Amino acid sequence: MSDPLPAIAYDLFSKIDLRVATVLAAEAHPNADKLLKLKLDDGTPEGRQVCAGVRAWYDPATLVGKQVVIVANLEPRMLRGEVSAGMILAASDLKAEAVIGAEGKPGPEARDVVFLSVDKPVKAGSKVS
């Protein structure tokens, strides 16, 4: 476990917009070995694309339909030529850096990083508090 960060004021935390999103599509990022590119239903008509550094832990095909928790109000950034408009929250207990297996699939320690999710389906775009 990593060392805890210093406490922050509640008003800083209240500025973070946490939402539930549903993964509509997931694929390997074309320009980065460690990233996946995900299309999310975030409750808006246009949805959003997010890039996540979880390629060593997740097979993209297993993510479609999964509900995840996102930081919805991060400014979009370019990650290796692809827009990432938000961040998917994940927990990790990493002992060593994961390595992608021979066939491009996650290695044997596939659960070292896990996405945060909801325990029952909710409407995409639902606020997390």
Model-derived segments and spans:
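Phosphate-backbone binding interfaces of nucleic-acid-interacting proteins
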Residues: 1-129
